[in-house]
Amino acid sequence: MTETVTVLKKEPTCAELVHGQWKERQEDLKDPEYEALAFDYVAPHTFNDQPEGYWRWQFSWGGPSDELRAYVNEHYEIHRLEYWYLDWGDGACIQVQQDADAWAQMEQMIGPR
């Protein structure tokens, strides 16, 4: 009698991938020729459990997708910047430090209003 054993390969979660993906994306952002998909404002309550609006710099879409989300005060100054890595029902984010190049890039894109 032969017994068959099935081994399921677990795909890594977004939480396991987010730091590596952010490192790769930072390299992309150093290239002046790099073109992201979109830059727009996501109003509060656009999505469930999203009370605060944010500026979104979207790099890729679908599964997986990734983006920067800048949360600003009433003077359009960033008070929090997050990098999100998302993939079909899973997602993870990390806080981007204020001294990161991406912070300055987002400030330029948002600009004074």
Region spans (language model):
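Long, contiguous N-terminal structural blocks used for assembly/anchoring
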Residues: 1-50
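Generic surface-pattern signal
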Residues: 23, 27-31, 73, 108-112
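Hydrophobic transmembrane signal anchors and adjacent membrane-proximal interface regions, especially
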Residues: 3-8, 70, 93-96
